[in-house]
């Protein structure tokens, strides 16, 4: 039995509705995540934790700069084998 054009049109519209809803849900989730991240950052700023994380970040960056040449040479030696 051959499906009619109306059946095909219904399926196309149904698929478009599903895709539209998934895109809308993703946009809402992104907006929620952005708002949550901003609220988290604001709470840290109000609590005075920003300077602590800035200091810790600098310490991590210094350690990474010191460790980078060793890590690069180790990876290069693994690639040569």
Curated annotation (Swiss-Prot):
Keyword Lyase: no
Gene Ontology MF term list: toxin activity
One Pfam family linked to the record: Pilosulin
Tissue specificity field: Expressed by the venom gland.
Compartments it resides in: Secreted
Entry's Gene Ontology BP terms: defense response to bacterium; killing of cells of another organism
Keywords, in A-Z order: Antibiotic, Antimicrobial, Cytolysis, Hemolysis, Secreted, Signal, Toxin
Propeptide: 26-47
Signal peptide: 1-25
Processing after translation: Truncated sequences of this peptide have also been found in the venom. It is possible they have been cleaved in the venom.
Gene Ontology cellular-component annotations: extracellular region
Keyword Secreted set for record: yes
InterPro entries recorded: Pilosulin
Function: Cationic amphipathic alpha-helical peptide with antimicrobial activities against E.coli (MIC=6.2 uM), S.aureus (MIC=6.2 uM), and S.cerevisiae (MIC=50 uM). Also shows histamine-releasing activity (30.1% at 10 uM) and a weak hemolytic activity (10.4% at 50 uM).
Record-stated family: Belongs to the formicidae venom precursor-01 superfamily.
Protein name as it appears in the record: U-poneritoxin(01)-Om2a
Species the sequence originates in: Odontomachus monticola
């Amino acid at each position: 039995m051959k499906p009619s054009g109306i059946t095909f049109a219904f399926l196309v519209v149904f698929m478009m509705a599903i895709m539209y809803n998934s895109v809308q849900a993703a946009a809402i989730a992104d907006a929620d995540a952005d708002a949550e991240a901003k609220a988290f950052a604001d709470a840290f700023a109000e609590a005075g934790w920003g300077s602590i994380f800035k200091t810790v970040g600098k310490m991590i960056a210094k350690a990474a700069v010191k460790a980078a040449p060793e890590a690069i040479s180790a990876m290069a030696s693994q690639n040569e084998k």
